[in-house]
Amino acid sequence: MKIYVDGREVIINDNERNLLEALKNVGIEIPNLCYLSEASIYGACRMCLVEINGQITTSCTLKPYEGMKVKTNTPEIYEMRRNILELILATHNRDCTTCDRNGSCKLQKYAEDFGIRKIRFEALKKEHVRDESAPVVRDTSKCILCGDCVRVCEEIQGVGVIEFAKRGFESVVTTAFDTPLIETECVLCGQCVAYCPTGALSIRNDIDKLIEALESDKIVIGMIAPAVRAAIQEEFGIDEDVAMAEKLVSFLKTIGFDKVFDVSFGADLVAYEEAHEFYERLKKGERLPQFTSCCPAWVKHAEHTYPQYLQNLSSVKSPQQALGTVIKKIYARKLGVPEEKIFLVSFMPCTAKKFEAEREEHEGIVDIVLTTRELAQLIKMSRIDINRVEPQPFDRPYGVSSQAGLGFGKAGGVFSCVLSVLNEEIGIEKVDVKSPEDGIRVAEVTLKDGTSFKGAVIYGLGKVKKFLEERKDVEIIEVMACNYGCVGGGGQPYPNDSRIREHRAKVLRDTMGIKSLLTPVENLFLMKLYEEDLKDEHTRHEILHTTYRPRRRYPEKDVEILPVPNGEKRTVKVCLGTSCYTKGSYEILKKLVDYVKENDMEGKIEVLGTFCVENCGASPNVIVDDKIIGGATFEKVLEELSKNG
């Protein structure tokens, strides 16, 4: 298609989504603060104004047509853009030097580009909130109401934990009832952070904890994820460096790390264990489909939204936690030191990994998680030129990995790695990969023992619900919360859009190409670990496997009925939500209260009313201590109370 831009002829694709993208694809960048190619068109910021036949309109909402005449930089458009920026800045927190986005903020960049040195409009003040309850930090004083986070959370991730509230000047993006983020169903994927154009959303910085550890007498060990090495060079103006991981090892040793291991070894370990777990389930026809569990954002989403599928999640830990447990439980013993002596630092592309490390199931394993951006900050703080660092290999025994293990950093990597193990152990007769539909890839696999199954790769949590409703014939499903997998994690450098993520996936593939080992089975260090330290099933289960639990999507609000203030007690919570109430929970509550009173147990059994335990399909629900009883009856509650006292 031929259009005319500022008086010159330009050829664009016929199927462009809008004029904004069409111009971007031919090298003409129109300013914008609210446009996301992956989400719906919003048109709120008005920065992307262009003139068409004398009429000024937003380029993000305009479809190009043959012969269109476009003006992108008239004096009138320039003045309108400046006015918009000044109005935004008038109520914006302009403490740029202490902002997490200093140097990468789009608003800051445009203010510089348009030469804004003073604000002509009076600054009006409104109440702001800074929520630091979770690894994702919210600061409404820096929010420009672009709606990017709202659309990403709702449309791409299907979570919808944040939304616009109030009206006019008082408008704000917040959670339901202004609930702290950590108490909501937020999966902490960080995609809102990745797409936020300002510092309104950021990631909790844990560098100070590392500095403190480096100054102590602890053994400081680092481990680096695959996707980190594919992106960190962006912070230093390097297009691609397949030796970046080894340079990072050298840098970390320089600042005081004692050992640096490769999380790709943990990926080999997880894939090997998960392949055997899947094959056993497949042969028995139990707990299928098996979902991968490497992505902590997906795991948290499943706990909130799909409690019925928790038994289907692979019980194998993520590479971070599996390798971390091996280091703390096995490597520490071989060093002859208590595990508390080791301070373990995980370098990840992911914000949810911070939450994963803090889960009670993993307490004391990974001490801190630093994102790719935090690692870049660490390098900049040190004043060391990463380009001139002499590469060093990862430390043995957990520094050797396969191509397949390194592939965990991109979408499809986990499934491919599991297949590589099955091919080595059993043999694959045929793999038939179907054409992707809505970004979801499905493959039909036939093993040499005659067993066949289907596998799927899904990235973006918003695609999961529809897929599960429509497809019941898939036996193994890889789910990654972030588009393009871990290379698109919320902790990766800015910008973090689809084009950049595609490039990172390419860098990772190029890096995989220099690996001599193809599959985890070829990793002799992994096989030695199994032979020496993971010989029996009990040890493997203790070191490599974990558990999951249903989580509420809303804060727990209980009603005291028979409270017991202090002392040793059993607690019974009867759900009084609509579904449970209509199916008899109130009758259970009445019987329970009468039972406690008649048997003089008011100081021993606490009775509470609660609302929505996220298990409506099994109503009525009663929680005895921490155990949810679905399809509850008064008799079942008494039976549970009779256990352990």
UniProtKB/Swiss-Prot annotation:
Cofactor binding note from Swiss-Prot or TrEMBL: May bind 2 [2Fe-2S] clusters per subunit. May bind 4 [4Fe-4S] clusters per subunit.
Annotated ranges, domain 2Fe-2S ferredoxin-type: 1-76
Positions with a binding annotation for [4Fe-4S] cluster 2: 143, 146, 149, 196
Principal subcellular localisation of the protein: cytoplasm
Binding site for Fe(2+): 486
Needed co-factor(s): [2Fe-2S] cluster; [4Fe-4S] cluster; Fe(2+)
Catalytic activity annotation: 2 H2 + 2 oxidized [2Fe-2S]-[ferredoxin] + NAD(+) = 2 reduced [2Fe-2S]-[ferredoxin] + NADH + 3 H(+)
Pfam families: 2Fe-2S_thioredx (PF01257), Fe_hyd_lg_C (PF02906), Fe_hyd_SSU (PF02256), Fer2_4 (PF13510), Fer4_7 (PF12838), NADH-G_4Fe-4S_3 (PF10588)
Subcellular location: Cytoplasm
4Fe-4S ferredoxin-type domain sequence ranges: 133-164, 178-206
Entry keyword Transmembrane: no
Tagged with keyword Cell wall biogenesis/degradation: no
GO molecular function: 2 iron, 2 sulfur cluster binding; 4 iron, 4 sulfur cluster binding; metal ion binding; NADH dehydrogenase (ubiquinone) activity
Binding site for [4Fe-4S] cluster 3: 153, 186, 189, 192
Cellular component terms per the entry's GO annotation: cytoplasm; membrane
Record GO biological process: ATP synthesis coupled electron transport
Keyword line: 2Fe-2S, 4Fe-4S, Cytoplasm, Iron, Iron-sulfur, Metal-binding, NAD, Oxidoreductase, Repeat
Residues binding [4Fe-4S] cluster 1: 92, 96, 99, 105
Domain of life according to the entry: Bacteria
PANTHER family: NITRATE, FORMATE, IRON DEHYDROGENASE
Protein name per the record: Bifurcating [FeFe] hydrogenase alpha subunit
Organism expressing this protein natively: Thermotoga maritima (strain ATCC 43589 / DSM 3109 / JCM 10099 / NBRC 100826 / MSB8)
